[in-house]
Structures are given as structure tokens and as C-alpha cells.
């Protein structure tokens, strides 16, 4: 990944890009399982793509033992299959 003799701004940029890719992959793996599901109460998945604030709120509310936080902004959780 890191090679010597590279100017440091190039190195930094490459690292940043790699990290971004890694995060994207991890995020995709995780959110594939969550966001496609519908809320059992409101039966909608609105809120699944409602910007960063909502998403980070949902991220905080994920409890892997109890299940996964609902894709819409309500407070219900899914049991994990």
C-alpha cells in the first residue's frame, strides 16, 4: 500500500482514498442487510435515504444482540434472522 519515495501529499491522498473505499465497502455490507427491510409498524422504508443526520442516529441505535434498528425513523427494531 505505502511505497517509499512518494511525495507525502500523494501518500496521504492515496491513504484517504483507500480508507474511503474500505468504509464504503463495510457500510454497503452492513446497510444492505438493514435498509432494504420495511418497518413492521409503518410499513415504509422512508428515512432509509434521508441524509447523514438520520443515518448517524440510526447507527447509534443499532444493537447487534437485540436486532437491527428500523430503516424508517421510528423507534422499532427488527429481530435479526
Curated annotation (Swiss-Prot):
Protein name (record): Putative uncharacterized protein C1685.17
